[in-house]
Amino acid sequence: VDSLARALGASDLLADTGAAVRRFPMAITPYYASLIRRFDESDPIFAMAVPHGGEVVDPPFLSDDPLEEEHDSPVPNLVHRYRDRALLLVPSTCAMYCRHCTRKRVAGQQESAITDAELAVAVGYLRDHPEIHDVILSGGDPLTLPTERLEQILQAVRAVETIDVIRIGSRTPVTMPMRITHRLVTMLRRYSPIWINTHFNHPVELTPESMEACGRIVDAGMPLGNQSVLLHGVNDDAQVLEKLFRGLVRNRVRPYYLFQCDLVRGVERFRTPLSKGIEIMEYLRGRVSGIAIPTFVVDAPGGGGKIPLLPNYIVSMSPTHTVLRNFEGRMVSYPEPMERHDSTPAAAPHAGVATVFELCRGTATTLGPDDHGGCTAHGGGARRAACEVSDTTPGSPGAVSRRREPSRWSGYGTEDWSGLRPARRVSRPRALRGGAGGV
């Protein structure tokens, strides 16, 4: 903190940040610090990078791990929440520690990276779960690893035949663009298909250096997306985000997600009402090309996963017509087909999981919160000791309750892990490492 204050020529800059720094580490690259123009919270770069006394003030509904990633971690360094994808946390460090990070509990708390033994365990889990086709490397920031070490990790993951796509979540193109070298992207290209999601939050970050880094990634054949976070006082302004998204698309970066700030300790000052994000989405629709509009999502607390939030454009529905509202507020009537073809639901769920599909089919009359979600043999399998599924068919005397045990795993290559069985929490040699990244 003192070094930053001296570098910026603002010795009295951080009078109230001591407690915040003691709780959450601080790091900022000289490049990113050079983007600061005002030494207070009104500057977006300052707000995202410099500790603030508000980081030690927490309402009771905030937590260290609001997404319950550790509950969905069957082996160290790996999070398996969604059936077909997994998150692999490879380093615990970043070039710059964002003050709004969802993994503040671990990011930068210890400078470490996944070991060979831990990587072998994670890869073993991927091999034993062929339903996983998509692996996201996150952390920390994977692109802060030495190129040789990153290649070893990519090589190990790519060796799993059922993995179709590898994704990398990285803020390095934003905070340390000089790291995106020809040598790095040439190495990454060898493990194609690789998709990269970066993390621009404000137009000020769209510098010639960062755009050159993004261009180098795209020119190497890797699709590049962006995951922004809606931050009070930084980008909770429709015109600011319009400028950001237009600038990204102009430089071949596709806005992918706009995240509601997570319910993590230390970030209350950044949180906005959900209505603010919906308001911004309403503003963008019709003003900005569809390829420049991300999906606004809230990552549900308790490990509920991402929930998209959109303005409601349906005014009313009847068997013959649906009344819709367009981006101008004009209402139109859309005629439904003369013959209905919706007697069969569009898709069946995974076997043994009660969902809305059962209600549509008529094989169940009710669906409660304990009847689905996190109880299957894939993502969330360790979330409950057992799951109750209510199965009521028309004409039956009542609901038949059946108990399903969660999936079991054992070992995956190390003696310390061989005796473990599923539980709500999986004890492990050291804390799950973290950083910013989305699934």
Give each language-model segment a name.
Residues 101-113:
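Iron-sulfur (Fe-S) cluster-binding segments and ferredoxin-like electron-carrier domains
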Residues 150-157, 310-318:
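Short, electropositive alpha-helical surface patch
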Residues 1-29, 319-439:
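Radical SAM enzyme core and accessory elements
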Residues 111, 115-118, 129:
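Intrinsically disordered, low-complexity linker/loop segments enriched in Gly/Pro
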Residues 276-317:
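A C-terminal junction/extension of Radical SAM enzymes
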Residues 25-28, 72-103:
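N-terminal pre-triad scaffold of radical SAM enzymes
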Residues 1-80:
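Flexible, acidic/Gly-rich N-terminal and inter-domain linker regions that tether
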Residues 120-134, 143-288:
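Conserved AdoMet/S-adenosylmethionine-binding subsite of the radical SAM
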